């Protein structure tokens, strides 16, 4: 299924004394995991696995650089290490990625850089492309080439977005049959979160994505993630994302040629070894940064 064609469910707003608004919404597209697209290709092969491991390694490097090497304190790193375990990523590769993130002398590989590219699609959709690379020139050249092939060009677009923290969780295993959405909502309020999205089961990739997405202020990300972990929720993802501002977000209709071209653009970008995440100024696109086949 082309995830762009998934239809959003009804959104309802909840207002509390803290003046935070919590939302429930349908999941428009598959989740944020940049390697899930590779994993789900019908013709998985050694090359696809190599790219998958490479992106996991980049993610670990970035997570360690941003929040440190202790998975007890770094929720993003903890989820990446769990993903690495599931695909049997070599222990030596994991250790080297952690050391590179720390900048430890003797770690294998060149220095890595985190780069964000801002671009505008001809349709008016803005993109923020996040890359982790050990070769700035290679990354810039290849990413610009992909953008040009789809008529997009580098342009300032960050003003179209707001930065937020995102935590994806599954219900505590021992409470799966007894907990209701209201219980998760209460936990989100207690954690100091801003919004929560209840994700329909048919929109979930069980390995990579959570049943609930919680949005936070960037500074509260670790606090909220730790709160949910302390209540035995399974943390599927925890990181910073760019959310399009509602007043400037583009509403791209279903069966629109723009959808098809953006689908192809993002497919091509995610095939690039340096690209980690892509954010779009499409309405509700904080639910849809990866477009699955």
Swiss-Prot record:
The keyword Mitochondrion applies. It is found in: Mitochondrion. Keywords: Mitochondrion. The lineage of its organism: Eukaryota, Fungi, Dikarya, Ascomycota, Taphrinomycotina. HAMAP family: Transcrip_reg_TACO1. Signal peptide: none annotated. InterPro entries: Integrase-like_N, TACO1_YebC-like_2nd/3rd_dom, TACO1_YebC_N, Transcrip_reg_TACO1-like, Transcrip_reg_TACO1-like_dom3, YebC-like. GO terms for molecular function: translation activator activity. This is Probable transcriptional regulatory protein C8D2.12c. The keyword Cell membrane does not apply. Belongs to the TACO1 family. It comes from the Eukaryota. It holds the Pfam family TACO1_YebC_N. One of its GO terms (biological process) is positive regulation of mitochondrial translation. SUPFAM superfamilies: YebC-like (SSF75625). Gene3D superfamilies: 1.10.10.200, 3.30.70.980. GO terms for cellular component: mitochondrial matrix; mitochondrion.
């Amino acid at each position: 299924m082309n995830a762009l064609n998934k239809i959003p469910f009804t959104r309802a707003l909840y207002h509390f004394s803290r003046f935070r608004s919590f939302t429930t919404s349908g999941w428009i597209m598959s989740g944020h995991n940049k390697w899930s697209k590779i994993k789900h290709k019908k013709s998985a092969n050694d090359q696809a696995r190599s790219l998958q491991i490479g992106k996991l390694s980049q993610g670990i490097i970035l997570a360690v650089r941003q929040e440190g090497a202790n998975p007890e304190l770094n929720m993003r790193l903890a989820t990446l290490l769990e993903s690495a375990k599931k695909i049997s990523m070599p222990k030596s590769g994991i250790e080297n990625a952690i050391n590179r993130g720390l900048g430890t002398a003797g770690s294998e590989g060149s220095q890595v850089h985190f780069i964000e590219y801002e671009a505008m699609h001809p349709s008016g959709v803005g993109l923020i492309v996040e890359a982790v690379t050990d070769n700035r020139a290679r990354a810039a050249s290849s990413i610009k080439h992909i953008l040009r092939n789809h008529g997009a060009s580098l342009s300032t677009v960050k003003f179209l977005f707001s930065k937020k923290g995102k935590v994806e969780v599954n219900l505590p295993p021992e409470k799966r049959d007894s907990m209701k959405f209201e219980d998760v909502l209460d936990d989100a309020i207690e954690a100091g979160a801003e919004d929560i999205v209840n994700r329909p089961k048919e929109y979930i990739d069980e390995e990579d994505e959570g049943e609930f997405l919680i949005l936070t202020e960037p500074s509260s990300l670790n606090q909220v993630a730790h709160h949910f972990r302390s209540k035995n929720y399974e943390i599927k993802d925890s990181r910073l994302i760019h959310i399009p501002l509602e007043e400037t977000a583009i509403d791209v209709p279903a069966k629109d040629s723009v959808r098809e071209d953006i689908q192809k653009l993002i497919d091509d970008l995610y095939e690039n070894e340096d690209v980690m995440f892509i954010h779009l100024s499409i309405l509700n696109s904080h639910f849809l940064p990866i477009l699955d086949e």
